[in-house]
């Protein structure tokens, strides 16, 4: 057994050293691999090397690289098997493909505070009537959405979701699209917990009470530090309050999205969500929500309704950083719990 393992390691090292000579063999299709890549260990290693270059991955030694390669193979096997089973959406390689699902959850998902559904707000949006709604809404097309960001190794999804909604309503009300500071919320919203979870509502309340600086003036560093809001100069964007959308109701959420981007929560810990590449997602998730994102539109494709979601895992995940989640009619938590807890900023 030791001889076989040593030989495998030598083969791995050899191909890693010389694999760059044949990277052209790797076909990065829409899912990041081709069926030919699954035919031999050599092809898999070449694919892994190509993937490493694409995502700027570096490992401290050969042992770590071999360990990550084994996880990469397992994820690739899962992706390929699931793509043969599911319809309507598909999985693919992304920057998380060298992480086990447990590692992915630890680094990027975490959980929401237990009392996340019981937070203060100034008004509740209740409108179940979907008859007069626009057939589709996409706030990106209206210039109210900034580029997709990456939260890094910091459970600050709540801050990214809040900032995206404030950026959106500020554009709608003033005509100006500016990038705002997630780091200010991580540092200064004392009702939340920095890189260890937080609240949509209290961060929106912070913006209403204090305003929020531009991202360029208070840049993101993916770790909590002492609040510097009083030392940062330049303009601030301010809102007037916090609104909550009626829970577990499709109509109310669609109506709210038709007016502005909305902060929502989803369950994102599953392997399908980790490896999502495109299509209308409707599979393998429950409603135990653990991740805040931003609803920036809705629509239909192929007869299926969806909510358009902006995530904070960078543009390499999903559909250039977005996911379309299947709509569920009536009173329910929705697919992945997307109807469970939704908030938005009020700006006069």
From Swiss-Prot:
Note whether Isomerase occurs among the keywords.
Answer: no
Propeptide positions in this record?
A: 19-132
Q: Which Gene3D superfamilies match?
A: Cysteine proteinases (3.90.70.10)
**Signal peptide residue numbers:** 1-18
Give GO terms for biological process.
Answer: proteolysis
Task: Offer one Pfam family short name for this entry.
Answer: Inhibitor_I29
Q: Which catalysed reactions does the entry list for this protein?
A: Preferential cleavage: Gly-|-Xaa, in proteins and in small molecule substrates
Q: Which EC number(s) are documented for this chain?
A: 3.4.22.25
Alphabetically sorted, this entry's keywords are: Disulfide bond, Hydrolase, Protease, Signal, Thiol protease, Zymogen
Catalytic residue positions: 157, 291, 311
Q: Which InterPro entries match?
A: Papain-like_cys_pep_sf, Pept_asp_AS, Pept_cys_AS, Pept_his_AS, Peptidase_C1A, Peptidase_C1A_C, Peptidase_C1A_papain-like, Prot_inhib_I29
Root EC class: hydrolase
Q: Which CDD domains match?
A: Peptidase_C1A
Disulfide linkage: 154-195, 188-227, 285-336
Q: How is its activity regulated?
A: Not inhibited by cystatin.
What would be an example GO MF term here? cysteine-type peptidase activity
Q: Does the keyword Protease apply?
A: yes
Highest taxon, organism lineage:
Eukaryota
The UniProt family comment states: Belongs to the peptidase C1 family.
Share any extra remarks.
Answer: Substitution of the conserved Gly residue by Glu-155 could possibly explain the unusual specificity.
Q: What does this protein do?
A: Thiol protease with a substrate specificity very different from the other thiol proteases.
Name by which UniProt lists this protein: Papaya proteinase 4
